[in-house]
């Protein structure tokens, strides 16, 4: 009886009770007793703005700043303490009108710098409450770094360093190195791409790798994931970092090396390594690659909120989708990587500082033969890259393919003066050969080329088996294994993209008793959220409403 009764009183998203055809329902004495029991189950403690949670001063100041912004953008009804759920007419599109738009102050200084890309986590709009996410987007404030978030970052770094830590010999060499490393956006991206190349080689030599870059694009018009080439600026960059990639044997699911001596066997030459992988991987029928994410928890307890678990699985599915599409065609992946850089306002043809290149070679000598080829003007064996520099020479633009270096003549990548200015003998012995005029400059194009090729080596091995690993401290207490579902991913991506690109209204959590207690309690917008207030009001009125119905 109670189950039938509760089904009758399900709640719509707009919080109105479904009252159709209730007049035809007649209740006997047993029914009334069941109703009385049900009413005790749905009684909700009314929460008010006075029920303050214990917060640090920094957290409260952060929330106050957000609420001030949100009250201005989403003004509520006159004399109401609650804000509106409808964005103003000139800000209907969260991505184009707010997130990616740079805002200047009265003096022309940047007040909010727009971001012309989304992260995978930004697409998980229903991980918690989409209304909460909408307010966060429009507030344009960064996510508050609470203690558990900081602890999680430290734990992720520990896992990363366990596999990819910098060798002591590299640190010792760099301590004696005389020249500064460049740290601008161009060189940061060069470091990111180099590290990804290095880690993918480690995946094949040791059986696992961490913090692997991936990305894709979404068509903001159709709200669909793009599987081929990118057309224009309405195709939005989506970036992601994969916590854990494992090469495993299909019989025991344990990490398995393809070739432990991968670098040594191929003369520490990336060109030969990629050729070796291309020949060897098709024969490795007993090996697969699993994509996974790492979640850190304060205690050894797996999340029990269905929306949180679902979003975590979707996150890994996005990563799996991106790797598959980047691996289908290295030439298209190469163009997507170059576009990735330009979307970040980075000049893909800015030469990379020799100090950074030396640091890269110290970490992984496998790139050294490639840099020697570039220096001598020889092909590296990847047609789009080689074709670009060949066409520059054929068009008579030899003097313009490099930007001016810090030391050397304008329009040249000429490092000759470094030979005279470098005092450390160990540096000259190892890298003095690079202190000359280069035929071609080393740029981000090189790292994009090799990374695109390595993405291609992953494709034949990608498994539909995905995983989420739960840690508390250094202890992995649970691994949630599940299957890749491309249909579900595309469906969920379409829905979240419709929200981001202003094609549908925000969809808050369903206002059930459990949701209002668990989701709303720690929400930054708890005190100004009309959706929460209406939900609580509805439950408070539910008892009298049912009593009236029972009298029919």
From Swiss-Prot:
Keyword flag Iron: yes
Organism superkingdom: Eukaryota
Compartments (UniProt record): Mitochondrion
Cofactor requirements of the protein: Mg(2+); [4Fe-4S] cluster
Binding residue positions for [4Fe-4S] cluster: 129, 520, 523, 529
Gene Ontology BP, a term: interstrand cross-link repair
GO cellular component: mitochondrion; nucleus
InterPro entries linked: Exo5 (IPR016610), EXOV (IPR019190)
Pfam families, A to Z: Exo5
Record-listed E.C. numbers: 3.1.-.-
The keyword Transcription is assigned to this record: no
A GO MF term: single-stranded DNA 5'-3' DNA exonuclease activity
Cofactor note as given: Binds 1 [4Fe-4S] cluster.
Predominant location: mitochondrion
Keyword terms, alphabetized: 4Fe-4S, DNA-binding, Exonuclease, Hydrolase, Iron, Iron-sulfur, Magnesium, Metal-binding, Mitochondrion, Nuclease, Transit peptide
Enzyme class: hydrolase
Protein task: Single strand DNA specific 5' exonuclease involved in mitochondrial DNA replication and recombination. Releases dinucleotides as main products of catalysis. Has the capacity to slide across 5'double-stranded DNA or 5'RNA sequences and resumes cutting two nucleotides downstream of the double-stranded-to-single-stranded junction or RNA-to-DNA junction, respectively.
Family to which this protein belongs: Belongs to the EXO5 family.
Quaternary data: Monomer.
The name this protein goes by in its record: Exonuclease V, mitochondrial
Species of origin: Kluyveromyces lactis (strain ATCC 8585 / CBS 2359 / DSM 70799 / NBRC 1267 / NRRL Y-1140 / WM37)
Organism lineage string: Eukaryota, Fungi, Dikarya, Ascomycota, Saccharomycotina
Gene behind this protein: EXO5
